[in-house]
Amino acid sequence: MKNDKVVFFKDDHSYWLGDQQIPSVGKFTGRFYDSFEDSFWKTHITLKRILGEEYMDHYRSFKKFQPDAIDLFEPILRDISPIEFHKVKKVVDDEWTKKRNKANFNGTKFHNLKEEKAYLDGFLINPFDGKKYPVTRHESEFDNETITLDFMSLPDGGYLEMLVVAPDFSVAGQSDEVYIETIDGVRYIDINDTKTNEKKPAKSSLSYYLPPLDYMYASTHNKYAIQINSYAHILSLYGFVPRNLGYTHYKKYDENSGVLQVLPVMKKEIEIIFDKNLHF
């Protein structure tokens, strides 16, 4: 594989420059919040199904959002048959997996239909300014690849599933929609991602980011904000100026239901994340 582009493989969600694997934005940002949240909630749901209000009374006795898992679960698990617990938890795990797989399938299908429509139309409507931006299909021999490594050479327009990579190849990611507009020599970027969560992404959470970002909820909304700001930061390293950032949430995969959530430019938080990752 040549070193003239970064490529993406969907099966393991990996990025490569030749034989060099490049960390993803998800890996960069995921180091700043606990990854056990799914496991926590699966256990919580399992105990609720087995013990009902007896467990919920215990859960509500904690005066903080998300108690430590050991403090919460250990006293209860001591009095439950391991066989019964694992039997019920397997059902919860299977339900969780089926729901996630269905959401991933439908979400991917929705993304693909939106992209194909934009290519057929020949333009994308920027949700921030309402203007039409020309789009061009860029063929790839992989699941995705960079259009060029000289990002500032890209013409103004809209870009779908744009693969971005830091100049030092320290991190890479993909953004659903990137809009480039040059005004008085300044190259502005707007970024919009498509989200199809069953519910509107929550802004609060039962957990927080890890220090030094522990003033922020580790909520779905904030994770999206950090992710999208990371794409903007990567492009800013080439000279682009982030102007408008956000994501559009669609209900039940209905294109007419989209609601744009505008995000702030989080320069301080992103610089902390990128600086810390360089020292891992």
Positions of predicted regions on the chain:
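Metal-dependent nuclease catalytic regions and adjoining charged, substrate-binding loops involved
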Residues: 218-225, 230-280
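Catalytic cores of nuclease domains that cleave nucleic-acid phosphodiester backbones
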Residues: 90-211
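Generic surface-pattern signal
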Residues: 52, 78, 97, 115, ...
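Accessory terminal regions of nucleic-acid processing enzymes
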Residues: 1-2, 119, 168, 199, ...
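Charged, glycine-rich intrinsically disordered N-terminal tails and low-complexity linkers that flank
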Residues: 1-109
